[in-house]
From Swiss-Prot:
Protein name listed in UniProt: NADH dehydrogenase [ubiquinone] flavoprotein 2, mitochondrial
NCBIfam families reported in the protein's UniProt record: nuoE_fam, PRK07539.1-2, PRK07539.1-5
Gene3D superfamilies: Glutaredoxin (3.40.30.10), NADH-quinone oxidoreductase subunit E (1.10.10.1590)
Species of origin: Homo sapiens
Transit peptide: 1-32
Documented EC number(s): 7.1.1.2
GO CC annotation, single: mitochondrial inner membrane
Subunit comment: Core subunit of respiratory chain NADH dehydrogenase (Complex I) which is composed of 45 different subunits. This is a component of the flavoprotein-sulfur (FP) fragment of the enzyme.
PROSITE patterns: COMPLEX1_24K
Gene (name only): NDUFV2
One GO term (biological process): cardiac muscle tissue development
CDD domains: TRX_Fd_NuoE (cd03064)
Length: 249
């Protein structure tokens, strides 16, 4: 097949153009550590294969109960919940904890690494006692989540990705947490705090500093995710069994 000189020159130009972009992309990825903490492990004094970790006797019993939920010979299916158990015990997941999970479940360590590096809910770096996760995806952003993030940073004196010197708070941004109807919202450890204002999040932080756990849920007075102006349907308790059924049936 023959191409004109102009077409060949155009193709060569496009190849060079995209080649530069690919090279720049690869260079950027390498500079950032191929995804930073997500994909790369480098031994540190606090995170290496010799970092002490073992499950407590109570958690070994929990692991036995978890494994029983899966068919015999399929312990590998329990990797996610057992990793979560390790994180709850230790606060985060050093590589030694991943190795222990692999040992307990009798799977290759790589199978555990694959899971721990894929899901961002696993913390592969130490985090504070209270892990503040601010949703900044579109619905929350449209409901002024930026003001929530700014208020937290100002209140704690830290930036996104940082931990307070007293190790009490870690602040990160996250993608959608599935509570768009209650935007803006944040997740702190396992709890959702919704319908927030800057004042609300400051009060929540004050309570946490005082050692109290604020009541989760909407801060606007809503019970759940009903319309802000009040219920428009389902305004009374549901009828009992048999309601509306033809007599005699």
């Amino acid at each position: 097949m023959f191409f004109s000189a102009a077409l060949r020159a155009r193709a060569a130009g496009l190849t060079a153009h995209w080649g530069r972009h690919v090279r720049n992309l690869h260079k950027t990825v390498m500079q950032n550590g191929a995804g930073g903490a997500l994909f790369v492990h480098r031994d540190t004094p606090e995170n290496n294969p010799d970092t002490p970790f073992d499950f407590t006797p109570e958690n070994y019993k929990r692991i036995e109960a978890i494994v029983k939920n899966y068919p015999e010979g399929h312990k590998a299916a329990a990797v996610l919940p057992v990793l979560d158990l390790a994180q709850r015990q230790n606060g985060w997941l050093p590589i030694s904890a991943m190795n222990k999970v692999a040992e307990v479940l009798q799977v290759p360590p790589m199978r555990v690494y694959e899971v721990a590096t894929f899901y961002t809910m696993y913390n592969r770096k130490p985090v504070g006692k209270y892990h503040i996760q601010v949703c900044t995806t579109t619905p929350c952003m449209l409901r002024n989540s930026d003001s929530i993030l700014e208020a937290i940073q100002k209140k704690l004196g830290i930036k996104v990705g940082e931990t307070t010197p007293d190790k009490l708070f870690t602040l990160i941004e996250v993608e959608c947490l599935g509570a768009c109807v209650n935007a803006p919202m944040v997740q702190i450890n396992d709890n959702y705090y919704e319908d927030l204002t800057a004042k609300d999040i400051e009060e929540i932080i004050d309570e946490l500093k005082a050692g109290k756990i604020p009541k989760p849920g909407p801060r606007s007075g809503r019970f759940s995710c009903e319309p802000a102006g009040g219920l428009t349907s389902l305004t009374e308790p549901p009828k009992g069994p048999g309601f509306g059924v033809q007599a005699g049936l």
